[in-house]
Amino acid sequence: MSGNGGGIGTGLGSLAGSGRTVTTIAEVRAAADAVRAAGGRVGFFGTSGALHEGHLTVIRRMAAECDLSIMPLFLAPVPGVTSDAVPAYDRDFDADAALAFDAGVNLVFRPAVAEMYPALPVRTAVVPADELAAPWEGAEDPSFLRMAATALAKYYNIVGPCRAYTGEKDWVPLTVLRRMVVDLSIRAEIVACPVVRLADGLCASSRNSRLSAADRAAAPTLYAALTAAVAAVEAGERDAEAIRSLLRRRISAVAPVDYAEVVDATTLARVDPLAGELRLLVSADFTGTHLFDNVGLTVRDADADADARVTVPAVGTTAAAPATDRRTSG
């Protein structure tokens, strides 16, 4: 088991401890405070469970960079917080905890609903600004981004100053979190980890387990469309609408398109022509399961001869997981 603390060599393993489960906010705060008081670094990775290789890759990085690695395992119907947008894939929290400990988590936080939310329904929420949230909410329940931001703000408040790890796969929630910690002066440093892809290019995702065989075979079209769009930009295309049309055309051949966008990587504002640090964002509905993907692109200048550079790893170089295990195949 690798979850034994001291990730950055500060000798705080005895404070962090090997993998253990706690159930109260006070226990989490006591552990984090002790490590910080000794000069150590606290890491936090928020997830709702159903761990797969994408999650585990983030956890391993957190464990390598922090002296105490904390992960929650909590998902329950909470009026005012939870959303129907959270998919109903299977969760085995005991198995998830074992995987997390093996990857380097020191502390799994498994609170009861009454511990997390003693007064229901919840009356306070973090509401992302319309320019960050509105264009993307059509893919799912409009309350999803609010739910995610509210839950993570609460976790960051519980843990205290920390490095807050997340993945680049969900670029819109990542952007919301980055803005939230700045706007609300939350003492969390957002650490974004690259997308983990399976050998065929599909993002590692818990949602993959809900796909039919036909949809699973078609799903890599998302990344294929993104790479085709990148190739078009590298060949000199600077018309953002042309890139959006290319993405929609490729993806609509296999699934209804929720959105296919080219945006500023920081603000999520639509761009045209293509210039600067950009993100290509796509989402499609595979028989009720919404899959998301994105790639980063730097266009140094809007001129036709400008250089374009892809900023994500090639297919299969980050992770290729066995298809027989849902926890490593999606």
Curated annotation (Swiss-Prot):
Gene3D superfamilies, per database record: HUPs (3.40.50.620), Pantoate-beta-alanine ligase, C-terminal domain (3.30.1300.10)
A biological process term (GO) from this entry: pantothenate biosynthetic process
> What pathway does the annotation place this protein in?
Cofactor biosynthesis; (R)-pantothenate biosynthesis; (R)-pantothenate from (R)-pantoate and beta-alanine: step 1/1
GO cellular component entries: cytosol
EC number(s) on record?
A: 6.3.2.1
- What's an example of a GO molecular-function annotation for this chain? pantoate-beta-alanine ligase activity
Q: What is its main location?
A: cytoplasm
Q: Which UniProt keywords apply?
A: ATP-binding, Cytoplasm, Ligase, Nucleotide-binding, Pantothenate biosynthesis
Tagged with keyword Manganese = no
- Specify the superkingdom: Bacteria
Report the locations given in the UniProt record: Cytoplasm
Question: Misc remark for this entry?
Answer: The reaction proceeds by a bi uni uni bi ping pong mechanism.
Q: Which PANTHER family match?
A: CYTIDYLATE KINASE/PANTOATE-BETA-ALANINE LIGASE, PANTOATE--BETA-ALANINE LIGASE
Give the protein's function.
Catalyzes the condensation of pantoate with beta-alanine in an ATP-dependent reaction via a pantoyl-adenylate intermediate.
What's this protein's family per the entry?
Belongs to the pantothenate synthetase family.
Q: How does it assemble?
A: Homodimer.
Name it: Pantothenate synthetase 2
